Amino acid sequence: MPTRLTNYFLRTLREDPADAEVTSHRLLVRAGYIRRQAPGVFAWLPLGLRVKAKIERIIREELAAAGAHEVHFPALLPREPYEITGRWEEYGDALFHLKDRKGADYLLAPTHEEAFTLLVKDLYSSYKDLPLTIFQIQDKYRDEARPRAGLLRGREFTMKDAYSFDATDAGLDVSYQAQRDAYERIFARLGLDFVIVQADAGAMGGSRSEEFLHPTPIGEDTFVRSAGGYAANVEAFTTVAPPARPFEGLPSPEVHDTPNAPTIQALVEVANEQSPRPDGRVWTAADTLKNVVLALTHLDGTRELVVVGLPGDREVDLKRAEVAFAPAGVEAATEDDFAANPGLVKGYIGPWSAGGPVLGEEAATGLRFLVDLRVVDGSGWITGANLPGKHVFGLVAGRDFDWDGTVEVAEVKAGDPAPDGSGPVELARGMEIGHVFQLGRKYADALGLTVLDENGKLVTVTMGSYGIGVTRILAIIAEENNDDKGLVWPEAVAPFDVHVVAAGREQVAFDVAEQAVAQLEAVGLDVLYDDRPKVSPGVKFGDAELIGVPRVLVVGRGAAQGEVELWDRRGGNHTTLPLSEAVAALTTSS
């Protein structure tokens, strides 16, 4: 039976929702696909469910072809497994916490590693049961501080999460590649451009980690890529350290008066005025060592200040810092932090003063001093002297100051060398649509998932984790497939195959439209039929364009002669032809 608009639950809107930030949010609400319930929480209406179901069907088909089996877990899970793996604390405020009437702690699951691991532990005990890959498509929950952009960053979202279980690392490599290949097929069928980038595993843990990013200007992620094929999320980018330099012939450090120069820009200006370079070049921000104080909050609640030294032409990238210091939280030091550490002279912080080392666990301040990988033995710097209005010139790393370790927190810039030697990188924006991890034995170790191997010895199972953001994909498809009139869905995920519009006021238009619907359904096409009798053609046309079914068949003025108009929403073509030819054309293109 066709879906008739006279009795379909649908209401389109002429005005954009006030809170819409991106095109997909605006059009999905206006066209009647979703409806906001709370910040980051949406109701799914019939049209939206149809598109979502088609995306899920493609995912299921490709995962089944890769040998995965579908299961379904509850969203409400007990605290204990997450506490055992440490994620109850690691996720922090991002978890939705609940208590039952007896006071027991529960959560709304952000991901299900623990549940999958315990299920396999309960049921499997031998290497003969492996390899195994199981998945679910289910709603997830994260208490986003600032949900935004409609479905792109919500508190409730639908996700496909799959997990592989193998007795050996070699087996994990095979399972991982099978899922990676399946992802490529899924995104190709959905018509999504994607880039596979090296990524950080974050709170998920594990070793090998890759993201599938859809390049888009509204993307939340910055990634880098080189002409030679290197690609990585900025959080996973590895800085190429320059070679160490000899100390011989380098002058001793000198402390200079640099009043009113607490910023890098002011320092460079003063340096070029007071102490021009002997080689005739000008001092730049890259010649200065910026020392930034960061505050770390550890899982036990303790707060630690660390000082990070990096070239002055670089800013601290907080996302990279969060990865570098995980699982601790990271923020800039506050005025109270500086007040509690008078040895740090704000605006003039440096690792060395006339009295000797200042920073480092063995120095007077006792603060850890970590440096960027570009700070190598023999490199000379202009940096703070830990005295108001004073900087030290010619301070040489490895000779005049040491550090407690290196850290990757500096921003990545276009032109930085790729770590694999494939050339300079460029920066781009993208939105994560899929993520594959080799979790290894983190969760199996924590939860005791072992099997007997072929020698009768207990071995810990090694795992992979594979996620796809279903609702995010739907939003991205909407974001990339629209025009000034409304949505234009790709045929693979469109809510219907054909949208038939009875546009005339005479009964003959409705009679011919009924014939068209019957013939289209007879050849297996899924039809949305606008049979509303008291709605003007203009309103019907507007709704058809807004809803975005890519092929529209209009029955109007030519109905009495058996002619209809075929619209190609994507190409913009309108063709008048006999009904039989229109049905044949729609059948051929399906």
Swiss-Prot record:
It is found in: Cytoplasm. GO terms for molecular function: aminoacyl-tRNA deacylase activity; ATP binding; proline-tRNA ligase activity. It catalyses: tRNA(Pro) + L-proline + ATP = L-prolyl-tRNA(Pro) + AMP + diphosphate. InterPro entries: aa-tRNA-synt_IIb, aa-tRNA-synth_II, aa-tRNA-synth_II/BPL/LPL, Anticodon-bd, Anticodon-bd_dom_sf, Pro-tRNA-ligase_IIa, Pro-tRNA-synth_IIa_bac-type, Pro-tRNA-Synthase_IIa_type1. It comes from the Bacteria. Pfam families: HGTP_anticodon, tRNA-synt_2b, tRNA_edit. The keyword ATP-binding applies. PANTHER family: MITOCHONDRIAL RIBOSOME PROTEIN L39/PROLYL-TRNA LIGASE FAMILY MEMBER, PROLINE--TRNA LIGASE. Consists of three domains: the N-terminal catalytic domain, the editing domain and the C-terminal anticodon-binding domain. This is Proline--tRNA ligase. The gene is proS.
